[in-house]
Each structure stands twice: as structure tokens, then as C-alpha cells.
Amino acid sequence: GNGSGSGSGMDSGIQESRLQSFTASSDLKDIHFKFDQYDLDDNSRAVLQKNAEYLKNNPNLHVEVQGHCDERGTNNYNIALGERRAHSTKKYLVAQGVNSRNVHVISYGEEKPFCFSSGEVCWQENRRAHFMVSK
């Protein structure tokens, strides 16, 4: 196909996200969360404002917001928490003027850690929203 379809069905955003190939972008910075939290602090909002400007200046980019957690808690709990982190991140980007159709969310819970040690320093690195892009 030519990629011009608009998707269909209630879950089209999820399906579209899985069909697209997302890659890392050095232009979009991760944000981090406190333990068991998904609300955005001032540092996160400042980073997201810069990410939003980049996305608005590149309107053809699609971004996948990946919610991640540390290893504490059950798998199911962390998948749900990661999803809340990704959604709160998307909500903020959209409030800054990013096209909501270009922002896709997914949760990896504790499945894709950035840091593999145990302990607060490492856990802090793993409690994050990570950004991948697709044209």
C-alpha cells in the first residue's frame, strides 16, 4: 500500500503502532518518574516541552511513547503503571500542540530495563517514558 489509509476500528492507534517501524531518536529525551508514580514533575514537563517543539517542527513524524517501570511489583501491575506513564506523557505532548494521531503509546512494564542492577540508582533509570520515531 501507499500508507495513506486512516486505520479503522477502536484500536486503530494500537494496531498502527505495531505496523510501523520505530527507531530511536537522539532529538527526543526520556523522562523519569518517582516510584509508583505516573504524574509529571517540573523536570519532566521541561523535557516534554522541548520534545513537543521538535515534534511540532517535524509534523510527519510519528512517535511511540514507551512506558517503563523498575523491577519491583508484579508484571501485571507494572504493565498497567507503564501504560499510565505513557498516557500521561502523551496527554502532556498533545496539550502542547502535538497531533494526537501521531502519538502512540505502549507499555513494556519491567520487561525492557535500561539498567540491569538492583538498587535505587538503577531503578530510577528504569522508571521512564522512552520515545521512538517513525516517518
Role assignments for model-derived ranges:
Residues 1-62:
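Periplasmic peptidoglycan-binding/tethering modules of Gram-negative envelope proteins
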Residues 23-27, 64-67, 91-94:
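A broad, low-specificity signal for short, low-complexity segments enriched in glycine/proline
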Residues 68-135:
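Periplasmic OmpA-like peptidoglycan-binding domain that tethers envelope proteins to the cell wall
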